[in-house]
């Protein structure tokens, strides 16, 4: 599809509401306005007008807003029609626009308005992604950080790194251009000092980006264990409500239950699973297989044991089959010794060579705050994101790649035995992957993936 087409889409959620908005962008916007409204509204002024179909029938009445290029969200001529939020009314108005004679207007693809804003230099790629992140924010802190990204906080940090790398490259390439002259650009210590400064600044951005990624995506916590050890009780204790059915009958939970909570602004996706055991029940077997699938994708596993029937404080003596199914080294596990109210164990968190275990009571809630603190610490989430920004996995990957290139450049420099061309190439590669974050360098495939995840009207 061409980026020169005029596009239209509903900018408000599908369904009934007090207000429904259609957004039009492109070169035929003025013609659409004259056909539907009978006039071109005054730029950036709200006008109350009738919305008509091609036969002149009034479909609705509402507010029309016209934003001429380039002073609009997309950088193109944009018209917004704000009418009543009934789906039938909006559908009739949308059909009227699409069926205008001698005017080519099509339905926008998901994220196409934001994509055009990016292509017309109204937003960089980080800011465009922040539009979707602001809409999808699940916590107040995530919304604030998404707004910071939209305002350019993250982009500014990346551009400062790129600018520093540009300075370094100029300095090194100058030494290559004047290699036959009696001018030594590389012996005054500036390269080493500047390179160390860039590496330090990049490390700070990476640390903040990891916090931003946690805030955006949250942490997936899977509650696992044998039947009837208190998994569902722990889910209820963490969420603060009776989310799961709790009985003394083993196998009560047969499917995956999902809930979301917050710890100091960080979203946690808590997943309760079926008790893991050998069974002949075909329905329970399906639930157990789903439990394993969730376990394999977890950021952290809370493996619960009944403290009143077991004295073990690590998972592997309790269940050797666990290690056969999943690798011990890559599984972040916290052992939960439940029912401290029955055993009399002290509510506490203990670190051992085998891992971490917490004694608590899911029934009374004793030790739940300790578990919350533990989850926050294990993910490295500080909770202090004042002035911070959100980040995505692709941002973290680009920052990690840039760090590797810079460390390679630093090692070459420290060895004292290097070619200036190789040093300059490492810096160029670092600069290139950083530029991919903001979209200064990007592939069409990457843009398609990013913008296709947006809602239609954005």
Swiss-Prot record:
Stretches assigned to the TrmE-type G domain: 218-380
Subcellular location per the Swiss-Prot or TrEMBL entry: Cytoplasm
Amino acids binding GTP: 228-233, 247-253, 272-275, 361-363
Ligand binding (K(+)): 228, 247, 249, 252
Pfam (any one): MMR_HSR1
Residues that bind (6S)-5-formyl-5,6,7,8-tetrahydrofolate: 23, 80, 122, 458
Residues the entry annotates as binding Mg(2+): 232, 253
Main location: cytoplasm
Entry's Gene Ontology molecular function annotations: GTP binding; GTPase activity; metal ion binding
EC number: 3.6.-.-
Cofactor: K(+)
Cystine crosslinks: none
Family to which the UniProt record says this protein belongs: Belongs to the TRAFAC class TrmE-Era-EngA-EngB-Septin-like GTPase superfamily. TrmE GTPase family.
Record text on subunit structure and interactions: Homodimer. Heterotetramer of two MnmE and two MnmG subunits.
Functional description taken from the UniProt entry: Exhibits a very high intrinsic GTPase hydrolysis rate. Involved in the addition of a carboxymethylaminomethyl (cmnm) group at the wobble position (U34) of certain tRNAs, forming tRNA-cmnm(5)s(2)U34.
Protein name listed in UniProt: tRNA modification GTPase MnmE
Species this protein is from: Hamiltonella defensa subsp. Acyrthosiphon pisum (strain 5AT)
């Amino acid at each position: 599809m061409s980026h020169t087409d005029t596009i239209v889409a509903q900018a408000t959620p599908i369904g009934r509401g007090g207000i429904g908005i259609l957004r039009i962008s492109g070169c035929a916007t003025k013609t659409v306005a004259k056909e539907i409204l009978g006039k071109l509204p005054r730029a950036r002024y709200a006008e109350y007008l009738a919305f008509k179909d091609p036969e002149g029938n009034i479909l609705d009445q509402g507010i029309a807003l016209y934003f001429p290029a380039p002073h609009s969200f997309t950088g193109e001529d944009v018209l917004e029609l704000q009418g009543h939020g009934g789906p039938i009314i909006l559908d009739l108005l949308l059909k009227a626009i699409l069926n205008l004679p001698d005017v080519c207007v099509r339905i926008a693809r998901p994220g196409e308005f934001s994509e055009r804003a990016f292509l017309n230099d109204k937003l960089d790629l980080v800011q465009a992604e922040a539009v979707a992140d602001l809409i999808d924010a699940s916590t107040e802190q995530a919304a604030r950080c998404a707004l910071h990204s939209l305002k350019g906080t993250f982009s500014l940090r990346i551009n400062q790194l790129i600018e520093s790398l540009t300075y370094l490259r100029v300095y090194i390439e100058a030494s290559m251009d004047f290699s036959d002259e009696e001018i030594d650009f590389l012996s005054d210590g500036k390269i080493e000092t500047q390179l160390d400064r860039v590496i330090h600044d990049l490390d700070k951005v990476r640390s903040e980006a990891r916090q931003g990624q946690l805030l955006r995506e949250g942490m997936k916590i899977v509650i696992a264990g044998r039947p009837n050890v208190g998994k569902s009780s722990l889910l209820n204790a963490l969420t603060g409500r009776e989310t799961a059915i709790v009985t003394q009958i083993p196998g009560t939970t047969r499917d995956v239950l999902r809930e979301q909570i917050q710890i100091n602004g960080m979203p946690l996706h808590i997943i309760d699973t079926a008790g893991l055991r050998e069974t002949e029940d075909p329905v329970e077997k399906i639930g157990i297989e789903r439990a394993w699938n969730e376990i394999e994708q977890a950021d952290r596993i809370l493996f619960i044991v009944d403290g009143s029937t077991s004295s073990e404080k690590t998972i592997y003596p309790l269940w050797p089959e666990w290690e056969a199914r999943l690798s011990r080294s890559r599984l972040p596990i916290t052992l939960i010794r439940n029912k401290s109210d029955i055993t009399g164990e002290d509510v506490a968190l203990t670190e051992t060579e085998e891992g971490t275990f917490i004694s608590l009571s899911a029934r009374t809630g004793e030790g739940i705050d300790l578990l919350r603190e533990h989850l926050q610490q294990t993910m490295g989430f500080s909770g202090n994101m004042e002035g911070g920004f959100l980040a995505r996995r692709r941002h973290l990957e680009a920052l990690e790649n840039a760090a590797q290139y810079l460390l390679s450049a630093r090692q070459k420099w420290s060895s004292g035995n290097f070619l200036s061309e190789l040093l300059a190439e490492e810096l160029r590669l670092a600069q290139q992957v950083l530029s991919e974050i903001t979209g200064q360098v990007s592939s069409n495939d990457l843009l398609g993936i990013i913008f296709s995840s947006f809602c239609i009207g954005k």
